[in-house]
């Protein structure tokens, strides 16, 4: 039985920090978007994202994927710092003190609230050193046309940087399936960079996700 006095004395349990209605604030007259702490948010139209892909492809060719990936790594580094600061202050504990399921749920809601689609993590291959990350309704996949390969390089860079800082290991992320190519989701394999060296070639050869994953695991065993 919960004591009434405890309910009156103890602070209210924190809810979902990244709940859209509470996290995103807007002023239509000024054209401003802010988060619940007053930090500025930036809304990017799909035409702008499409122009980034088209322009980089025309100017840099195949190097466009590296440019976007490195932009994602830089973005992910700053995103990780802000993410940790915000949830640590709200939940009154450090990221290291949080249960992994609690941390991932925060990241999932954050991903969705920022308009990046949905995000999920599959940890069943951690015994071999790999994490499988899955996103759906990616704004990046929806604007990149005619690349004939997975195109969410920004997201791959974000995942690489975010989880590298979270784990203290130098991790790398490579996309294996993409909504831009008709897949129902975007899948990424996350692991140590030296273990993922063969993946880029397998993706270029058109190998499916399961085949690539089996190849990686067999190379370790």
Describe each model-derived feature in a short phrase.
Residues 1-131, 137-154, 172-221:
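N-terminal accessory segment detector
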Residues 152-168:
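Active-site helix/loop of acyl-thioester processing domains in fatty-acid/polyketide metabolism
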């Amino acid at each position: 039985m919960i004591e009434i006095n405890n309910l009156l004395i103890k602070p209210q349990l924190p809810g979902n920090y990244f709940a859209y209605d509470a996290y995103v604030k807007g002023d239509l007259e000024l054209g401003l978007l802010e988060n619940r702490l007053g930090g500025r948010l930036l809304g990017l139209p799909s035409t702008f994202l499409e122009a980034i892909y088209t322009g980089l492809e025309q100017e840099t060719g195949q190097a466009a994927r590296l440019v976007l990936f490195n932009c994602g790594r830089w973005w992910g580094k700053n995103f990780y710092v802000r993410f940790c600061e915000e949830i640590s202050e709200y939940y009154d504990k450090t990221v290291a003190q949080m249960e992994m399921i609690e941390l991932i749920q925060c990241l999932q809601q954050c991903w969705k609230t920022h308009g990046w689609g949905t995000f999920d993590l599959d940890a069943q291959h951690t015994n071999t050193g790999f994490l499988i990350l899955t996103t759906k309704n990616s704004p990046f996949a929806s604007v990149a046309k005619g690349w004939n390969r997975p195109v969410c390089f920004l997201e791959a860079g974000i995942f690489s940087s975010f989880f590298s800082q979270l784990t203290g290991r130098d991790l790398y992320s490579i996309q294996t399936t993409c909504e831009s190519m008709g897949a129902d989701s975007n899948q990424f394999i996350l692991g140590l960079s030296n273990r993922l060296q063969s993946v880029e070639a397998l993706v270029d050869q058109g190998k499916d996700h399961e085949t690539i994953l089996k190849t990686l695991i067999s190379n370790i065993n």
